[in-house]
UniProtKB/Swiss-Prot annotation:
EC number, as in UniProt: 4.1.1.37
Positions contributing to substrate binding: 28-32, 78, 160, 215, 333
Protein family per UniProt: Belongs to the uroporphyrinogen decarboxylase family.
Marked site (Transition state stabilizer) residue numbers: 78
Function: Catalyzes the decarboxylation of four acetate groups of uroporphyrinogen-III to yield coproporphyrinogen-III.
Pathway: Porphyrin-containing compound metabolism; protoporphyrin-IX biosynthesis; coproporphyrinogen-III from 5-aminolevulinate: step 4/4
Subcellular location: Cytoplasm
Source domain of life: Bacteria
Protein name, as recorded: Uroporphyrinogen decarboxylase
Subunit text: Homodimer.
Length: 364
């Protein structure tokens, strides 16, 4: 049966093609701010019970789409699936965030690292991708919106692997980077190979765009960022399948705190660059000069403001970018668990409505 994508606005925006309006999706759009997500998570018993069960992962992936007219679905998973598949023993303790039972800190630890067999260790992820694609598609082969796959970046994965969890200052991983760069590069090399294989497996399973989350790239100094993060993102991008089933598969990279390096990130071969809220979107568009699309960049805490302020700030982001192709509206980071779903509805409505006016010249 031929498959038809009913809403391809997101994919066309990533490829800098004209669209009738600005598409929107939200980082962490399936998450704790939704009561239905919390109900599903309670049934699953734990976060990992949710993420590692394709049925539950599919259910929560679709929840925000059933509530809001978003323009893309994103696979429900976690960025730490790869190091978990490497045998580091991922666990989530209530109120503590992710922890690894076996952090990577010594020469012997690094020597044991290997690229995991994706089918064998991460089949639950590719299974979820296939199941979500089916759930997005009706009996006539019509798919509602595209599905985004994702991974953490090699550096961001290394931060958690070496620290053994989250960190305020990343002193353990940074100390390794400066005192034993040979070990750091060995970790990053394995991670880059694993991330590329993982994203390609998601593409083969049906992901129609992929995103690399470099959450902690901005923790690095200039120079160190290029050596320990950007170079390895470039390696990943060079290995990715850019076409599947006759369709292009766009690639997005997001470095939180990476606005300083926008031009360099845009030169890695990606189709789009995600931006946090510290960057002026109009200036960023001029800096990349049409080489890539841009994704972002509303401060997620604006969603705590009254609806009129949410709408005003959404218009400000759209006005900053201007009436040009190549913009995907998003937050500058993941949505807070304390956000009101009603305010998200206001945001999505304003982005769609106001961007249509911009296209027609009726805004103002």
């Amino acid at each position: 049966m031929a498959h038809t994508l009913l809403n391809d606005t997101f994919l066309r925006a990533l490829l800098r093609e004209p669209t009738d309006y600005t598409p929107i999706w939200l980082m962490r759009q399936a998450g704790r701010y939704l009561p239905e997500y919390n109900a599903t998570r309670a049934r699953a018993g734990s976060f990992l019970g949710l993420a590692k069960n394709p049925d539950y992962a599919t259910e929560v992936t679709l929840q925000p789409l059933d509530r809001f007219p978003l323009d893309a679905a994103i696979l429900f998973s976690d960025i730490l699936t790869i190091p978990d598949a490497m045998g580091l023993g991922l666990d989530f303790q209530a109120g503590e965030g992710p922890k690894f039972a076996h952090p990577v800190r010594t020469e012997a630890d690094v020597a044991k690292l290997a690229v995991p067999d994706i089918d064998e260790t991460l089949g639950y992820v590719t299974g979820a991708v296939r199941e979500i694609r089916r759930a997005l598609t009706d009996g006539q082969g019509r798919q509602r919106v595209p599905l985004i796959g994702f991974s953490g970046s090699p550096w961001t994965l290394a931060c958690y692997m070496v620290e053994g969890g989250g960190s305020d200052d990343f002193r353990t991983v940074k100390s390794m980077a400066y005192s034993r760069p040979d070990l750091m590069h060995r970790i990053l090399d394995v991670n880059a190979q694993a991330v590329a294989a993982y994203l390609n497996a998601q593409i083969e399973a049906g992901a129609q765009a992929v995103m690399i989350f470099d959450t902690w790239g901005g923790a690095l100094a200039d120079g160190a960022y290029q050596r320990f993060s950007l170079d390895y993102i470039r390696r990943v991008v060079a290995q990715l399948k850019r076409e599947h089933d006759g369709e292009r598969v766009p690639v997005i990279t997001f470095t939180k705190g990476g606005g300083l390096w926008l031009e360099e990130i845009a030169a890695t071969g990606v189709d789009a660059v995600g931006l946090d809220w510290t960057v002026n979107l109009g200036a960023a568009r001029e800096r990349v000069a049409g080489r890539v699309a841009l994704q972002g960049n509303l401060d997620p805490t604006i969603l705590f403001a009254p609806p009129a302020a949410v709408r005003e700030q959404a218009r400000a982001v759209l006005d900053s970018y201007g009436n040009h192709p190549g913009h995907v509206f998003n937050l500058g980071h993941g949505i807070s668990q304390f956000t009101s779903p009603d305010h998200v509805a206001e945001l999505v409505d304003e982005v769609h409505g106001y961007s249509r006016k911009l296209r027609s010249g009726a805004a103002g």
